[in-house]
UniProtKB/Swiss-Prot annotation:
Region feature G5, mapped onto this chain: 174-176
Family matches, as InterPro entries: EF-Tu_GTP-bd, EF-Tu_GTPase, EFTu-like_2, EFTU_2, G_TR_CS, P-loop_NTPase, Small_GTP-bd, T_Tr_GTP-bd_dom
EC number(s) on file: 3.6.5.3
Family: Belongs to the TRAFAC class translation factor GTPase superfamily. Classic translation factor GTPase family. EF-Tu/EF-1A subfamily.
Organism: Caulobacter sp. (strain K31)
Binding annotation for Mg(2+): T26
Span list, region G4: 136-139
Chain spans, region G2: 60-64
SUPFAM superfamilies in UniProt: EF-Tu/eEF-1alpha/eIF2-gamma C-terminal domain, P-loop containing nucleoside triphosphate hydrolases, Translation proteins
Region spans: G1: 19-26
One GO cellular component term: cytosol
Official protein name in the record: Elongation factor Tu 1
Subcellular location field: Cytoplasm
Function: GTP hydrolase that promotes the GTP-dependent binding of aminoacyl-tRNA to the A-site of ribosomes during protein biosynthesis.
Length: 396
């Protein structure tokens, strides 16, 4: 039902709720839809609708995620909420539900807890650009000084993970009071105030089409009399006939010119993000290009072999490994369209990684791959997915 109602004439932004178990993430999600429904910006959902999150698969991993959508005066939002902590870890690492920003929910009665810390760290590692805070359950705290103490703790915690803790907006309220229609100051008004901070503080993401051109190579053909065609789906940006492009990854970077773009056997002047195209390359031989490389705007992306990853390792039940792995483990890393072998080094003081763990790993690939921070990958053994990861930092 809700699908027809939204006019896509506002800028779109993807957000989510993060924070410790039982601090009120799902209740807040419900409260936002209920309050915004009053002005026609959402379809009201109750807690049970959101909590019964459907399963979905991302990079071979099953994740439970609930999606709701709503709009404010300024923007249209897709909002993701996960039922369990493991779902958050998997979601953020696989990028199944992209987050342009997140609402960190902290209970005023408890203050920051272990998963509060872990979700902030994950947000930092996977590159969530901005966070705002909703301090929930203030109806359970009578002492104003205690609220100030919790706020100070949250700000210090955010700063310790390189978020601007002093500047991040913190809204105090109670999602439950908002749903029950109680005291509007901590109920409805707090939800509207929170949405204003989300509108104002979370930056509008670049649309894929506005970013520098990038297309992972899926296949290569040679067409007699015309040259070499590489096919794939354009991930970002635009490529125009006559423009210079680079072929990056696996071997030395090559420069060439795009002499044609084809889609559905029709010739185009340009291809753009989302299009499945064939790109004709001038003077490039069939054997100069292979699957796993990328075609890109010159200088926009570089090949690397060493990086720091944040990874989630599947449990046995999820089809992953049955046993832990140790330092010098050599699986395949599946980037975009191809597998590359890499060596994992565990961090100082970490003896092994168990199935179901998420951890920071140092990785060295045997061949360079075009990468930047935030690139997602799967960890595989003989074609079977055993984990998922994201490039947190490039080393060389």
């Amino acid at each position: 039902m809700a699908k027809e109602k939204f006019e896509r004439n506002k800028p779109h932004c993807n957000i989510g709720t993060i924070g410790h178990v039982d601090h009120g993430k799902t209740t807040l999600t419900a409260a936002i839809t209920i309050i915004l429904a009053k002005s026609g910006g959402a379809t009201a959902k109750n807690y049970a609708d959101i909590d019964a999150a459907p399963e979905e698969k991302a990079r071979g991993i099953t994740i439970n995620t609930a999606h709701v959508e709503y709009e404010t005066a300024n923007r249209h939002y897709a909002h993701v909420d996960c039922p369990g902590h493991a779902d958050y870890v998997k979601n953020m690492i696989t990028g199944a539900a992209q987050m342009d920003g997140a609402i960190l929910v902290v209970s005023a009665a408890d203050g920051p807890m272990p998963q509060t810390r872990e979700h902030i760290l994950l947000a930092r590692q996977v590159g969530v650009p901005a966070l705002v805070v909703y301090m929930n359950k203030v109806d359970l705290v009578d002492d104003e000084e205690l609220l100030e103490l919790v706020e100070m703790e949250v700000r210090e915690l955010l700063s310790s993970y390189d978020f601007p803790g002093d500047d991040i907006p913190i809204t105090k309220g109670s999602a439950k009071v908002a749903i029950d229609g109680g005291d509007p100051v901590i109920g409805e008004q707090s939800i509207l105030a929170l949405m204003k901070t989300v509108d104002d503080y979370i930056p509008q993401p670049d649309r894929p089409i506005d970013l520098p051109f990038l297309m992972p190579v899926e296949d290569v053909f040679s067409i007699s009399g015309r040259g070499t065609v590489v096919t794939g789906r354009i991930e970002k940006g635009v490529v125009k006939v006559g423009e210079e492009v680079e072929i990056v990854g696996i071997r030395a970077v090559q420069k060439t010119t795009c002499t044609g773009v084809e889609m559905f056997r029709k010739l185009l002047d340009q291809g753009q993000a989302g299009d499945n195209v064939g790109v004709l390359l001038r003077g490039t031989k069939r054997e100069d290009v292979e699957r796993g490389q990328v075609l890109c705007k010159p200088g926009s992306i570089t090949p690397h072999t060493k990086f720091v990853a944040e990874a989630y390792i599947l449990t046995k039940e999820e089809g992953g490994r049955h046993t832990p792995f140790f330092t010098n483990y050599r699986p395949q890393f599946y980037f975009r369209t191809t597998d590359v072998t890499g060596i994992i080094k565990l961090r100082e003081g970490v003896e092994m990684i168990m199935p179901g763990d998420n951890a920071e790993l140092d990785v060295e690939l045997i061949t360079p791959i075009a990468m930047d921070q935030g690139l997602r990958f799967a960890i595989r053994e003989g074609g079977r997915t055993v984990g998922a990861g994201v490039v947190a930092k490039i080393v060389e």
